[in-house]
Amino acid sequence: MFLLLQILYILLFLNLADTSDDEYRLLKDLREGYDPMERPVSDHMKPVNVKLRLILQQLVDVDEKNQVITLVVWTQYTWNDYKMKWSPEEYGNITSLQIPFGTLWKPDILLFNSANEHFDSSFPVNMVVSNDGNVLFAPPGIMQFSCSLSMTWFPYDEQVCYLKFGSWTYGKKLDLRIDDADLPEGHKMDLQYYVPNGEFDLISTPAFRKSTTFLDETYVELYFHMHLKRRTMYYGLNWIIPSILISLSNILGFTMPVECGEKVTLQITNFLSIMVFLAMVSEVAPPTSESIPIIAAFFSFAIVILGVSICVSLITVNIFYRHPKMHRMGDWTRYIFLEWLPWFLLMSRPDHVFRKPKREKKKEEEEDEESNAGGKEEESELISQKQQRPRLLVNSQIVMDSTIPYLEEVIGYLKVFKAKLDDDEEEEEEILNWRFMAMVIDRASLFLFTGLIFGTTFVIFAACPNLFSADQIIETEPVIT
């Protein structure tokens, strides 16, 4: 048994030695007379046909502030080298070889809109050569490329970016084409190994080929587009809904009584909270004046509304604590805020009848005094008639004359007391009128600012072109190897 194992081991070793020897001979024969600077074409007038296939693995990051997108991509180049052909039967049935980077000719294809500090970030891997002369070069790399990101509809935005590939020096000597074999309709990137991104959905990956002229030389360029759509759940739950709730809680401040002392404090706190959300948007958006993100416009309108509501609340507090000795309510103010606006807002004061101001009462009293002047003349005539009565009434008249001054004095005190009570009652009435006016302004502000917030929110977000659109999202299953 042991002898059999030794024989098998020797045969295996001899087979490996033969294979290694065949591979060595093949490499030696292929390298003989080969110059990696020479284009692999038999006719120098013909271009080298190179196919490019992008294998997208992951969308790493979308940097809106710096307008840079980071991808993990495998760039697969294929071309035919006529000097790399051999007959497998002559070399131990070897059909492919792994040749180190730099040994063979390689197209100088670069990502033109690269934002990487090293420009070309691909890793120099080996080249795979087949016996028919086909060369496969698939270097992986982390690509960073610039893209003009439009933040107008952020966070309900869609972005279309492209990767621009082309030869740096060969011009028309290199015919660059898109390798889209076995790819779905409308997709020019290989998404077999794509890992979905948590912030953006990949909608489509079209591509096209374009020829340009530079310094009297024709160059072929390939544009690989990426249609991205932002996922909005995070921003809706953490930005938009909280800001709407903060705005509504600010409106509820109009239902708080002025005496509690926290009315304006609540609104100022909400105002500062919205300012924090606006600062968060400024951290994400690029410092450009081309467009304002729609969510920044929403926060700006919310800040304006909250600022105006704070001013209205301060005016309400001022009106609430007004005193009739310091401020006089005008006739139009009284009519609008104590009669018409309460009627319009369905507000009423229980068991209350609006009284005329004191100045109007004085006018009526003056008119009453003028009308009573004739009564005093009649009273003097009656007194003269009494003086002509018989002497039987003299004693009673004397008694009445002696008590009249005391009665007049008592009546005078009663009038003063009544006037004091009337003044106090009217003053209290005016104080209540000012307070009721403040309540009316609060109620009107409640309805007005509620309508403004809901109306502004609806108008702004209804303008989003893709708020309710349902694009077909590319979904890939994980590849298990």
From Swiss-Prot:
Extracellular compartment spans: 20-235
Region (Disordered): 356-384
Membrane topology note: Multi-pass membrane protein
Signal peptide feature range: 1-19
Residues listed as glycosylation sites in the UniProt record: N93
Any one GO MF annotation of this record: acetylcholine-gated monoatomic cation-selective channel activity
Quaternary structure and partners: Neuronal AChR seems to be composed of two different type of subunits: alpha and beta.
Family to which this protein belongs: Belongs to the ligand-gated ion channel (TC 1.A.9) family. Acetylcholine receptor (TC 1.A.9.1) subfamily.
Protein name per UniProt: Neuronal acetylcholine receptor subunit eat-2
Biological source species: Caenorhabditis briggsae
